[in-house]
């Protein structure tokens, strides 16, 4: 017997929590059920009892299309799960984010949990990347902040194009959807120039966001986003 419940962080489109009538985070509850991740994502053929959580990112277009979806691999065992998510994301659609009354392209960080036990399979979805401080404060099912991707972000022109680099940017995100005090942690490759780092800080501070939500309320949170080439 195969059971595949789909657990949404947002109960329904009508019940989606917002700080105002003109703001809504992107969510998986797309009206056409055959285009949802829950319909398209297939559980990989794996033997035995398993529990795997994949941390993923995607650019959610204003039309709900998922673009550039990728997941972090901890080891080779994660590969079939990463491939399954990538395959489903190519066809899936999401309800796009709404900021200031307009649908906007956003950077989404989410997790997918695959559980197989006693021949039963479940796939759970979390609209947050699982940062410890936010999970401790708001639980596993909070909806993390989502950053609007601008057309001409400063870092695109200021940062290296060829030499590989990657870093994390950590900032405070208020319930009003404003980011403050970004700090940068270098993670791999070359260390970008200060011009690049300042451009990234400028991008974070000047961007629009949907705030983090917990129990239907906009709340302050830690916002962390990876940057790389």
Describe the predicted segments one by one:
Residues 10-19:
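Hydrophobic h-region of N-terminal signal peptides that target proteins for export
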Residues 2-9:
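Sec-dependent signal peptide recognition
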Residues 18-229:
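Charge-biased low-complexity segments
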């Amino acid at each position: 017997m195969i059971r595949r419940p789909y657990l949404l962080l947002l109960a329904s489109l009508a019940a989606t929590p917002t700080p105002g009538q003109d703001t809504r985070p992107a969510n998986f509850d797309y009206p056409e059920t055959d285009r949802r991740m829950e319909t398209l994502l297939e559980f990989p053929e794996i033997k035995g009892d398993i529990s795997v959580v994949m941390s993923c990112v995607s650019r959610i277009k204003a039309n709900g299309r998922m673009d550039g979806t990728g997941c972090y691999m901890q080891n080779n065992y994660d590969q079939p799960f990463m491939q399954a998510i990538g395959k489903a994301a190519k066809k899936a659609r999401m309800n796009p984010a709404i900021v200031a009354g307009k649908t906007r392209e956003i950077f989404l960080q989410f997790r997918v949990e695959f559980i197989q036990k006693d021949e039963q399979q479940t796939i759970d979805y979390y609209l947050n990347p699982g940062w410890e401080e936010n999970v401790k404060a708001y639980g596993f099912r909070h909806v993390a902040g989502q950053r609007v991707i601008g057309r001409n972000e400063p870092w695109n022109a200021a940062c290296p194009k060829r030499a590989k680099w990657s870093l994390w940017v950590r900032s405070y995100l208020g319930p009003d959807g404003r980011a403050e005090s970004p700090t940068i942690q270098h993670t791999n490759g070359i260390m970008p120039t200060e011009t690049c780092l300042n451009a990234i800080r400028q991008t974070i501070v000047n961007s629009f966001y949907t705030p983090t939500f917990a129990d239907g309320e906009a709340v302050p949170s830690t916002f962390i986003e990876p940057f790389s080439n």
